[in-house]
């Protein structure tokens, strides 16, 4: 909830191959003025951690002076809820007095606590102490001001100031976001993302080892998306230039999240390349530094799966999880591709050799590049098709990415029908883009979601080759998103699922165990802009039909169950809204939503205009 909690943010500038940052240690912080302005200095010298060396030295000339935090869009409190504030402080020149923590709104106090400050005797070392305060909200407010003040004149130093609601799952994850994610019933979670792994430069790439251990020892890093869409017109500097990574959620927390939502973890690793779209930087394979990237991969597996007394397994155990996380898959690079100067295939081979020398059971994910239409894609598949027959575990699946218009998805529901079956596919990043840009919740239309649902009928039909699939991106904060569409949008008060979210949810909740052949009927239906797939859940005996009606009128789908016989009423779940351009938003989160009804299978399936229908029919044979 607090922004720039360690006084370590930077302001980001630049363009391809030329990115740089300026110090912004005090970004988001200001002195209060009600009792006169205290002095705020951002200093270094004796930090709580050398990793984040800057901290605030605050001097109050009079009692009651303090400082407040921007906190993104301000603090949101819900009446009756408790919020825990933690911070490190050191009484540099503060022989008496306490520290007050408040959330205020328009001058009135909405939550408050006072903590006793630890005062060291004169002429002794003043050490850092960790403080904790519980704030109970007296009312529900938005745009509140988080404030810390001194009850007496003096100088106190502060660092790592945090505020979390007490209902945060595992003390880390915002509950409404967690519930939405768990509600998808995901089979796996790919983290921490794509381009973030690579970085604009190798200096700001995501280093998993910096994201584990004590929170105070995690280095703040600027975010690759802080410089998205910079240009000469905006001075190579956008409104998101202070987008930094505090690593409050690191690899330990990601593994824990996977465990809590019942998903397999799929971490992605850097292969010694910065983002190929934004940089020319790389570590040559014959340089000693390249070995560090290989070692990071091997050490990650030990961190996830190693014994509690191993080097990296002990780090996991110390953080509270002595049992292994059960990692089975690792992504080798993000959107990497082969060029005259970059031998990505050689890098993949080096990682495969290093990992499988110690962990032959780990499944590796390769990369087909940034798209599925260029020569990068063709070259990648030539490489994997050549290598996989010689060694079964060389590559578990090849990661394909496509952000395309809805029409492409409709036209390519048969995309995987003719794929060879010897090398598997991971549809690692995909989304329908009716429109795209920054901060566009309206980009997540019903029409876009229906196109994704139609495409997924083909993915599911070819589940023998497409073994993994994931929509991207997952989360977007309203007013802070550099990319649209996204699956789940939220602000400081609430979160909601988009039409695409409900498509993913319906697929996640209705996974069959066997895909059934439609004997070419799917091709005939496509001519009528109806897209379908049928599967069987052998555990329950249910036939599961997934059908998209891409028409402005209602359709009825007649059913012939063949050797199956209906053993009960069909249950239908329907996703639709007021036309293809309908979308959900913070103000109207249910414009596109699910509805349920029952029907007789003998009467067929009624498909409302512009809808996605999932029907479960209990059967016997």
Model-derived features with residue positions:
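Conserved, mostly hydrophobic/aromatic
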Residues: 87, 185, 258, 300, ...
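Active-site groove signature of glycoside hydrolases
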Residues: 150, 192-195, 271, 276, ...
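Extracellular and organelle-lumenal recognition/adhesion modules and their flexible linkers in secreted
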Residues: 1-246, 264, 282-291, 341-342, ...
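Carbohydrate-binding surface patches
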Residues: 529-566, 572, 610-613
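Catalytic-core region of carbohydrate-active enzymes that cleave or remodel glycosidic bonds
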Residues: 353-356, 387-392, 396-510, 538, ...
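An active-site-proximal structural segment forming one wall of the substrate-binding cleft
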Residues: 138, 166-186, 246-261, 288-329, ...
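C-terminal beta-strand-rich structural cap/linker in extracellular carbohydrate-active enzymes
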Residues: 591-621
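Aromatic-lined carbohydrate-recognition surfaces of secreted/lumenal glycan-active proteins
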Residues: 312-320, 356-377, 424-429, 465-476
């Amino acid at each position: 909830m607090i922004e720039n909690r360690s006084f370590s943010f930077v302001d980001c500038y630049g363009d391809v191959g030329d990115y740089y940052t300026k110090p912004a240690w005090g970004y988001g912080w200001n002195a209060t003025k009600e009792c006169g302005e205290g002095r705020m200095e951002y200093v270094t010298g004796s930090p709580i951690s050398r990793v984040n060396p800057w901290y605030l030295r605050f001097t109050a000339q009079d009692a009651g002076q303090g400082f407040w935090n921007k906190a993104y869009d301000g603090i949101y409190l819900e009446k009756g809820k408790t919020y825990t504030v933690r911070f490190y402080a050191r009484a540099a020149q503060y022989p008496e007095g306490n520290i007050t923590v408040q959330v205020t709104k328009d001058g009135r106090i909405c939550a408050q606590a006072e903590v006793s400050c630890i005062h060291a005797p004169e002429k002794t070392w003043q050490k850092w102490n960790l403080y904790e305060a519980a704030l109970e909200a007296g009312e529900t407010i938005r745009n509140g001001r988080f404030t810390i003040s001194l009850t007496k004149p003096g100088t106190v130093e502060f660092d790592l100031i945090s505020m979390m609601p007490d209902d945060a799952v595992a003390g880390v994850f915002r509950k409404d976001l967690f519930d939405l994610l768990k509600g998808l019933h995901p089979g796996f979670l790919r983290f921490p993302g794509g381009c973030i792994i690579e970085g604009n430069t190798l200096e700001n790439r995501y280093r998993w080892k910096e994201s584990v251990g004590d929170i105070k020892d995690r280095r703040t890093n600027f975010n690759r998306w802080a410089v998205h869409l910079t240009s000469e017109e905006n001075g190579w500097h956008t409104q998101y230039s202070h987008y930094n990574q505090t690593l409050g959620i690191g690899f330990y927390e990601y593994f824990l999240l996977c465990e809590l939502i019942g998903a397999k973890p799929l971490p992605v690793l850097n292969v010694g390349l910065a983002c190929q779209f934004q940089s020319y930087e790389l570590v040559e394979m014959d340089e000693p530094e390249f070995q560090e990237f290989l070692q990071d991969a091997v050490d990650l597996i030990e961190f996830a799966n190693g014994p509690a007394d191993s080097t990296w397994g002990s780090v996991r155990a110390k953080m509270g999880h002595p049992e292994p996380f059960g990692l089975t898959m690792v992504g080798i690079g993000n959107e990497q591709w082969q060029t005259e100067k970059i031998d990505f295939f050689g890098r993949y081979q080096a990682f495969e050799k290093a990992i499988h020398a110690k962990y032959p059971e780990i499944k590796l994910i390769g990369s087909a590049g940034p798209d599925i239409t260029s020569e990068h894609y063709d070259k990648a598949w030539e490489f994997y098709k050549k290598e996989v027959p010689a060694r079964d575990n060389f590559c578990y699946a090849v990661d394909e990415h496509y952000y395309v218009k809805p029409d492409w998805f409709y036209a390519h529901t048969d995309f995987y029908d003719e794929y060879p079956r010897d090398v598997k596919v991971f549809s690692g990043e995909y989304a329908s883009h009716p429109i795209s840009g920054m901060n566009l919740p309206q980009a997540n239309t019903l029409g876009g979601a229906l196109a994704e649902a139609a495409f997924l009928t083909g993915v599911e039909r070819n589940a023998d080759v497409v073994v993994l699939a994931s929509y991207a991106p997952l989360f977007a904060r309203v007013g802070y998103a550099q990319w649209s569409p996204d699956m789940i949008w939220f602000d400081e008060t609430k979160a909601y699922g988009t039409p695409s979210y409900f498509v993913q949810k319906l697929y996640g909740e209705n996974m069959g165990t066997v895909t059934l052949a439609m004997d070419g009927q799917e091709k005939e239906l496509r001519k009528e802009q109806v897209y379908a797939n049928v599967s069987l859940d052998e555990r329950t005996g249910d036939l599961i039909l997934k059908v998209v009606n891409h028409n402005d009128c209602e359709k009825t789908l007649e059913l012939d169950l063949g050797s199956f016989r209906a053993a009960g009423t069909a249950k239908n779940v329907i996703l639709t809204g007021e036309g293809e351009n309908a979308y959900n938003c913070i103000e109207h989160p249910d414009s596109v939503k699910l509805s349920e009804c029952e029907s007789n299978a003998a009467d067929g399936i009624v498909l409302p205009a512009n809808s996605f229908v999932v029907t479960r029919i209990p059967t016997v044979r």
